[in-house]
Structures are given as structure tokens and as C-alpha cells.
């Protein structure tokens, strides 16, 4: 097995089991313990895990970022479908839109497959695949594929996005904090979303109820950039008042 494939397999094991041991990995991959230690050191440099005596543990801040797209898509699945249906009216009069690679936004895109006259700019490899036979005109951002999140990232991605302007950008995030704004755990993905936000007239944030009052590693956007927050249930009186005071349309 090539080193890059072994490291990818180790990442998946850490994501699934939350911790691994050097001796166990050495036996599984039939390489020396020193080779495994070097692999774990590389993953620690990425911020994916923390090495411990005899092994390593998953960094919890990286958990949702590195679990595979399809595994994340199954979490809060009914809530995501509900949010997608509630978001549909905000796309009705739009002809151009940008979409991130989140599983929540993917549910909205599935509902738009028969929509003619709509152009979609996205860095989601899953969206490009699912919408290949749809009525939507799909514009890919290009870039380097993150095989876990199924998103396209990097310098090229941002350069392509800057060529366009869209009526609305739809995205999700890992957390919402009244003081910090919309937060994410993946810095590379956050940079793509920030670029999309700058190229959009309006921004809609699609989040399930678990994301409110939840911290994450990277600030994605402050609330001055958000026009709509669409969720599955009331986030509480404080959030309702906050959105009203900040001219954000809150839908649940």
C-alpha cells in the first residue's frame, strides 16, 4: 500500500474509533512502528489528531470535518429535509445561486433538480454528480478534491468563484454564536465559503437546531453578511430577538 493510501486509511480509522495505537496499526498495515509514528506525526501536523503515548486520539474540533460526507449526511437527515423545503421559497425568483458542499444544502439542491433557468455555482463534487442529468446549469469551481468532504478547495477554486456574481449563496456551518457569528471547523472550506459570500447579493444559512450556541474553530462570517437563517425548530427567544434586531429573517 502506498504511503498516502495508508495515511488516508489511518484517518478513517481514527475518525471511526476516535483513537488508535501504534502497535495495532503496525500489525494492520504490515509496516514498522516507526513508519506508523511518522504517519501519525503528519496527521498531527494537519491538526487531525493528537499523538499520545503509544498511539493517537482524534481532535474533536476536526471530527465533523473529516467524517465522510455520506456519514454526515445521515445525521439529522429528517431535519435537513425539512430545512430544505423551508428554503425553497427563497430560491423561487432567483436565476443564479452559489452553494457550499454541506449535506444540508445538498438536500435543497435535490429539490431543485427540475428547475430550469437556474445556474448553480458550487464546489460540491456530490452536487455536480447528482445534478448531472438535472435541468440546472451547473458551474464547477474546480480545485483540489477533498475526498472526505467531497468538496473542491484551494487557490484555483477561489479564483473561479471571483469570476461570477450570484443572486443568492446558500450554505451551512458547524456552529452559530451570537457574539462570533457563523463558525466552521475546516479552514480551507471556510475560505471557499467566504469567497462565495463576497460574490452574492444575499446569503442564506441553513442549519439544524443543534448548531445554535455552538462553537467551532474558524469564524466563517459575522451576522452582517447573513440575510436568512433557516432551521427546523425555534432557536429560542434570545435568537429570535437577535435576528429581528439585526434584520435577519429567521425561518423555522
UniProtKB/Swiss-Prot annotation:
GO biological process: regulation of DNA-templated transcription
Keywords: DNA-binding, Transcription, Transcription regulation
Molecular function in Gene Ontology: cis-regulatory region sequence-specific DNA binding; ligand-modulated transcription factor activity
InterPro entries per the UniProt record, alphabetical: Carb_Metab_HTH_regulators (IPR050313), DeoR-like_C (IPR014036), DeoR_HTH (IPR001034), NagB/RpiA_transferase-like (IPR037171), Tscrpt_reg_HTH_DeoR_CS (IPR018356), WH-like_DNA-bd_sf (IPR036388), WH_DNA-bd_sf (IPR036390)
Tagged with keyword Repeat: no
UniProt domain HTH deoR-type: residue ranges: 3-58
Species the sequence originates in: Escherichia coli (strain K12)
Keyword DNA-binding: yes
Protein name: Uncharacterized HTH-type transcriptional regulator YdjF
Organism superkingdom: Bacteria
DNA-binding region: 20-39
Amino acid at each position: 500500500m502506498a504511503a498516502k493510501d495508508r495515511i488516508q486509511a489511518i484517518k478513517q480509522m481514527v475518525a471511526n474509533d476516535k483513537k488508535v495505537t501504534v502497535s495495532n496499526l503496525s500489525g494492520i498495515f504490515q509496516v514498522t512502528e516507526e513508519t506508523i509514528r511518522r504517519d501519525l506525526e503528519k496527521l498531527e501536523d494537519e491538526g487531525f489528531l493528537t499523538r499520545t503515548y503509544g498511539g493517537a486520539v482524534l481532535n474533536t474540533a476536526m471530527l465533523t470535518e473529516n467524517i465522510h460526507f455520506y456519514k454526515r449526511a445521515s445525521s439529522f437527515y429528517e431535519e435537513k429535509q425539512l430545512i430544505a423545503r423551508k428554503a425553497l421559497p427563497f430560491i423561487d425568483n432567483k436565476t443564479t445561486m452559489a452553494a457550499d458542499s454541506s449535506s444540508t444544502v445538498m438536500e435543497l439542491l435535490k429539490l431543485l433538480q427540475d428547475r430550469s433557468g437556474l445556474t448553480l455555482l458550487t464546489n460540491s463534487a456530490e452536487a455536480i454528480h447528482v445534478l448531472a442529468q438535472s435541468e440546472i446549469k451547473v458551474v464547477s469551481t474546480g480545485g483540489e478534491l477533498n475526498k472526505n468532504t467531497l468538496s473542491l478547495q484551494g487557490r484555483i477554486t477561489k479564483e473561479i468563484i471571483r469570476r461570477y456574481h450570484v443572486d443568492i449563496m446558500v450554505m451551512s456551518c458547524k456552529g452559530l454564536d451570537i457574539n462570533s457569528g457563523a463558525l466552521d471547523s475546516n479552514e480551507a472550506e471556510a475560505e471557499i465559503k467566504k469567497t462565495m459570500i463576497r460574490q452574492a447579493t444575499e446569503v442564506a444559512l441553513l442549519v439544524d437546531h443543534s448548531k445554535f450556541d455552538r462553537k467551532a474553530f474558524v469564524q466563517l462570517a459575522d451576522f452582517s453578511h447573513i440575510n436568512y437563517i433557516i432551521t427546523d425548530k425555534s432557536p429560542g427567544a434570545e435568537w429570535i430577538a437577535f435576528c429581528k434586531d439585526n434584520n435577519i429573517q429567521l425561518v423555522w
